[in-house]
């Protein structure tokens, strides 16, 4: 409040003396001063950033996101990128005459869909992100769960659901669950100044590829790396109590809230794996997880380095000690 008051007095008293550009420079300086304690707190810490396909709606937005991530590296933070690619996979499937199907926010993945997913995630999106990191002045390196057997998993069992009162099994195909994250290769990459870019393709004991939701992978990797934060970027402003009302934004969610909100139908569709990924991370030592709108310019910097924040924060509620 005192900063705001001083700024108002300054503007009123000196607005005729100084140019608008000079005032703007002073405001920028205030932004840097506000960011300083956060930069000090986060220095040398690991942050896992999941960049969703829905956040990559344009080349300019993607460039802004990567610039922000490269900036984090330059101020001493160690970012790890996990990328999705759902819209791109769906688009590619459509061009190949195949319909995308989902169950509880997870893509049903038969053999053909698995091949398409690998083609899009590893051969297209991953290489584009690594290239863009280089253009923005950083050093990126592309990885999958195969590399160093980093992400080991198993195929999910068929799901039992009630359809018209009849219990039915739904086989979601090569959709996997993480068993083990081997972070050794990530530590090596980070210590050498690189930004790892991870496609969410895991491997099972027989060498089969598994499609694992990128939000879940990001949560598991954040936990394995003992990351300071997990950031999940999407195309909405965090969690909304009413999907049709942008003013129903929920700014904070505890682990205890998540199951209740899923049961109430507040958390549904693609937001379910996001909150589950956040919950896994926070349960396993990550201080906080943040769901933010990646299509808002520099939203990640606003969430990390300002007092206000703009997304939904997931944290572990600790009861006060008596």
Swiss-Prot record:
It holds the Pfam family AA_kinase. The record marks 50, 274 as: Transition state stabilizer. InterPro entries: AceGlu_kinase-like_sf (IPR036393), AcgluKinase_fam (IPR004662), ArgB (IPR037528), Asp/Glu/Uridylate_kinase (IPR001048), NAGK-C (IPR041727). GO terms for molecular function: acetylglutamate kinase activity; ATP binding. Catalyzes the ATP-dependent phosphorylation of N-acetyl-L-glutamate. GO terms for cellular component: cytoplasm. Signal peptide: none annotated. It is found in: Cytoplasm. Belongs to the acetylglutamate kinase family. ArgB subfamily. The keyword Transmembrane helix does not apply. Keywords: Amino-acid biosynthesis, Arginine biosynthesis, ATP-binding, Cytoplasm, Kinase, Nucleotide-binding, Transferase. It comes from the Archaea. This is Acetylglutamate kinase. Gene3D superfamilies: Acetylglutamate kinase-like. It catalyses: N-acetyl-L-glutamate + ATP = N-acetyl-L-glutamyl 5-phosphate + ADP. Pathway: Amino-acid biosynthesis; L-arginine biosynthesis; N(2)-acetyl-L-ornithine from L-glutamate: step 2/4. HAMAP family: ArgB. Its EC number is 2.7.2.8. It is an enzyme of class 2 (transferase). GO terms for biological process: arginine biosynthetic process via ornithine; L-arginine biosynthetic process. The gene is argB. Substrate binds at residues 85-86, 107, 211.
């Amino acid at each position: 409040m005192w900063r705001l008051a001083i700024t108002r007095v300054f503007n009123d008293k000196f607005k005729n003396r100084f140019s608008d550009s000079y005032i703007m420079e002073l405001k920028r300086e205030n932004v840097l001063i506000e960011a300083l304690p956060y930069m000090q707190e986060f220095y040398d810490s690991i942050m896992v950033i999941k960049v969703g396909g829905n956040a990559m709606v344009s080349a300019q937005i993607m460039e802004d996101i990567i610039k922000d991530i490269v900036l984090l590296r330059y101020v001493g933070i160690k970012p790890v990128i996990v990328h999705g690619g759902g819209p791109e996979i769906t688009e590619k499937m459509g061009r190949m005459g195949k319909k995308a199907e989902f169950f509880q926010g997870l893509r049903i993945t038969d053999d053909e869909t698995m091949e398409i997913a690998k083609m899009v995630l590893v051969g297209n999106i991953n290489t584009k992100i690594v290239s863009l990191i280089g253009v923005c002045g950083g050093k990126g390196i592309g990885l999958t769960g195969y590399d160093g057997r980093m992400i080991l998993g198993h195929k999910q069992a068929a799901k039992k659901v009630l359809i018209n009162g009849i219990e039915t099994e739904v086989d979601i195909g090569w959709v996997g669950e993480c068993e083990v994250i081997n972070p050794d290769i990530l530590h090596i990459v980070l210590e050498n100044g690189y930004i790892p870019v991870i496609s969410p393709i895991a491997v099972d004991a027989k060498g089969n590829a598994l499609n694992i939701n990128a939000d879940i992978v990001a949560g598991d990797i954040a936990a394995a790396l003992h990351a300071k934060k997990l950031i999940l970027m999407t195309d909405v402003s965090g969690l909304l109590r009413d999907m049709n009302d942008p003013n129903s934004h929920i700014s904070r969610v505890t682990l205890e809230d998540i199951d209740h909100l899923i049961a109430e139908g507040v958390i549904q569709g693609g937001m379910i794996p996001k909150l589950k990924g956040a919950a896994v991370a926070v349960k396993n030592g990550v201080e906080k997880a943040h769901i933010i709108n990646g299509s808002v310019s520099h939203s990640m910097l606003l969430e990390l380095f300002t007092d206000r924040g703009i997304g939904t924060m997931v944290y572990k509620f600790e009861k006060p000690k008596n």
